[in-house]
């Protein structure tokens, strides 16, 4: 889903070739059916890069990642206030749900809990 540069897509700034580390996030975006476009950068600050990516995306959502952190930003938020921040050491379900939530921001539907499993069933605790 990341090959067509003319279709509206979530812009993802990949800093220092780290996209392989965040595969679950990309799969979460794909699960929701929203296209994304990878933009490789040799260096940069993650929060600012995510905000710049959101500004460049017609979908108003941008993501940036380095080897330690991934940030989801929305164009209408202040540059210093990203919507979601994910650390690499968090579990794969949090990674997948962050991708789902970036796509859900585009769709305008409720977010998933970052730590819940996406089974489609509600659990009472």
Swiss-Prot record:
Keyword Metal-binding: yes
Role noted for this protein: Small subunit of the diol dehydratase-reactivating factor (DDR), which reactivates suicidally inhibited adenosylcobalamin-dependent diol dehydratase (DD, pddA, pddB, pddC). DDR acts as a chaperone, reactivates inactivated DD holoenzyme in the presence of ATP, Mg(2+) and free adenosylcobalamin (AdoCbl), by mediating the exchange of the tightly bound damaged cofactor AdoCbl for a free intact one. Reactivation takes place in two steps: ADP-dependent cobalamin release, and ATP-dependent dissociation of the DD apoenzyme-DDR complex.
Gene: ddrB
Quaternary structure and interacting proteins, as annotated: Component of the DDR complex, a heterotetramer of DdrA(2)/DdrB(2). The DDR complex interacts with the diol dehydratase complex in the presence of ADP but not ATP.
Cofactor: Mg(2+)
UniProt-annotated binding residues for Mg(2+): 31
Cofactor: binding comment: One Mg(2+)is bound by the enzyme, a second binds only to the beta-phosphate of DdrA-bound ADP. Co(2+), Mn(2+) and Ni(2+) can substitute in vitro.
Catalytic activity annotation: ATP + H2O = ADP + phosphate + H(+)
Family: Belongs to the DdrB/PduH family.
Protein name per its UniProtKB record: Diol dehydratase-reactivating factor small subunit
Keywords: Chaperone, Hydrolase, Magnesium, Metal-binding
GO MF, any single term: metal ion binding
């Amino acid at each position: 889903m990341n090959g067509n540069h003319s279709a509206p897509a979530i812009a993802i700034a990949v800093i220092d070739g780290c996209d392989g580390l965040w595969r679950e996030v990309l799969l979460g975006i794909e699960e929701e059916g929203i296209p994304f476009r990878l933009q490789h950068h040799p260096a940069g600050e993650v929060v600012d890069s995510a905000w710049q990516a959101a500004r460049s995306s017609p979908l108003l959502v941008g993501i940036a990642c380095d080897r330690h952190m991934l940030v989801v930003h929305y164009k209408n938020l202040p540059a210093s206030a990203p919507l979601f921040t994910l650390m690499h050491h968090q579990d794969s379900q949090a990674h997948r749900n962050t991708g789902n939530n970036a796509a859900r921001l585009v769709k305008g539907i409720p977010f998933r809990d970052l730590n819940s499993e996406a089974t489609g069933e509600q659990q009472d605790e």
